[in-house]
Amino acid sequence: FNTLFSSLNNLGVKVLESIALVLELPKNFFEEKVIRGNSTLRLLHYPPIESDSNVLRARAHADINLITLLVGAEEGGLEVQNKDDEWIPIKPNSKSIVCNIGDMMQLITEGNLKSTPHRVVEYSANDSKSRYSMPFFLHPSPDVVLKSVYNEDDKGVLAHDFLEERVKAIKLY
């Protein structure tokens, strides 16, 4: 577990380096912010569905963190919402990793990078199988101030407070 977690964290830092360069920030802009982050690795199991087709296995939502790395699933069902509000299926590939932008990244980029709404559906109960997903949620350290990368006067919000507010809003506690 520790090796996998460390590898995904290192990959996440590399993705953040690329994002920083696209945003015309120093390459290591995010590194200090995530070095002691609250990142989480989860294993999700979606059991087979026995009812009608088009069942939602996970309702539409966006992730709270900076970025999420979704380690390749072998079963389909993941869909992302595009800017026209259409749901686009992501073709499963066990050798790929999908990267979603989270709400914290959307906040600090003032919406220039949009948080990715996504859901998990079951297309056909006749062929339903268990689906496993392994998301790595890359979070900054709780004491990091999330503020605009474009506006130096932005007071921002503590990552801990932002996370707590969102978790309460979606009734996770």
Predicted features by range, described:
Residues 1-173:
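C-terminal flanking tails of non-heme Fe-dependent oxygenases
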